[in-house]
Amino acid sequence: MRISKASNIESTGVSNCKNFNSKNCSKYSLMEVQNKNEKKRSLTSFHAKNITLIFGIIYVALLGVYICASQYKQAADYSFRESRVLAEGKSTSKKNAKTALRKTKQTTLTSADPEGQIMKAWAADPEYRKHLNVLYQILNNTDPNDELETSADPEGQIMKAYAADPEYRKHLNVLYQILNNTDPNDEVESSADPEGQIMKAYAADPEYRKHVNVLYQILNNTDPNDELETSADPEGQIMKAYAADPEYRKHVNVLYQILNHTDSSEVETSADPEGQIMKAYAADPEYRKHVNVLYQILNHTDSSEVETSADPEGQIMKAYAADPEYRKHVNVLYQILNNTDPNDELETSADPEGQIMKAYAADPEYRKHVNVLYQILNNTDPNDELETSADPEGQIMKAYAADPEYRKHVNVLYQILNNTDPNDESS
């Protein structure tokens, strides 16, 4: 009995041990499988996350490229549309400018006005502004070096009443507005309008209207035959009526005689401007009438005595009648324009004859340069085909820059215009 029990106990223990070992073994093997599965799952999850991340990066990159390409395309389309609109705008503006140029009227300031000739270089070139300012100073009779000039200089026209009389300054400003073709009250047709200076005799005299209209065409660079010529071309102002009208040719020839100081009558000396008052002058009341009209305009006197607000008569100030100095200088200008000098035999400093030097008769070069001025005034250029016909600067030939002689003669003309002569005392 004891032995059997012992053997039973032993066998039971062994079986229990075996059962315990088998359980542990299965448990450990299950854990290993679970660990392996977890590792596989984590590795798979890691790879899946990496793949998802890579695809996300690729998607973001492609999306960025697409957005950039879309924006670039929009910018390119906008730039193309903008350039096309600008080109169409420039083309339209050019067409409108040409159309407005051809429809220019006296009462409007269109692109045919000389203001259109003030190029971009105006704002960029202080030298050009300086010289224009000098001209403005001359027109306004102001000279910073007035004490250094002679009494025959236009600076002598700066009267005491000038500084004290705002009315005179106002009227000089009107002249400046007229010369610059700018009128702040243009639509109102006020006294600043040059049309106001066309007196009653203008409407009654078709001959005078014709000649004034020619001058107006020249000053405004407009041509009724505009379609045949370029609208900006001063040459277009030499109209068909010029060649067909001997009356107008005669008057222009008189001006040419005055500028060149030559007399076809050969009665006077060729250097004497008095010789330019030809026999036809005294015999032709028509020409005398037109010169008298110019004198009336320059002296601001009108035989009609209407004294309209637009009339230059408004410029006759109280100081004018009271100041003999101003009257004297205006009379000097009248003498110069009419080429008559009461002191001719004395050869005074106010006499233009004193400015015609001895070299004038002996120097054919001077005559050549005066002819250049005549070409400029008549808007004709012998070298027109070589230069741009619309460009007045094209009349300043290459010889200008290379020829100091020409500069000297131009200075002589400047002296004449300013009524100062470096050889005045020796005349």
From Swiss-Prot:
Pfam family of the protein (one): GBP_repeat
The residues bearing each GBP repeat, given as ranges, are 109-149, 150-189, 190-229, 230-269, 270-307, 308-347, 348-387, 388-427
Which PROSITE patterns does the UniProt entry name for this protein? GBP (PS51069)
Q: Where is the signal peptide?
A: none
Q: Is the keyword Repeat assigned to this protein?
A: yes
Keywords, sorted A to Z: Malaria, Repeat
Does the keyword Repeat feature in the UniProt annotation? yes
The record ties this protein, via InterPro entries, to: Glycophorin-bd
Task: Mention any additional remark.
Answer: P.falciparum undergoes three cycles of development in its vertebrate host: the hepatic cycle; the asexual blood cycle, which includes the extracellular merozoite and the intraerythrocytic schizont; and the sexual gametocyte cycle.
Protein name from the UniProt record: Glycophorin-binding protein-related antigen
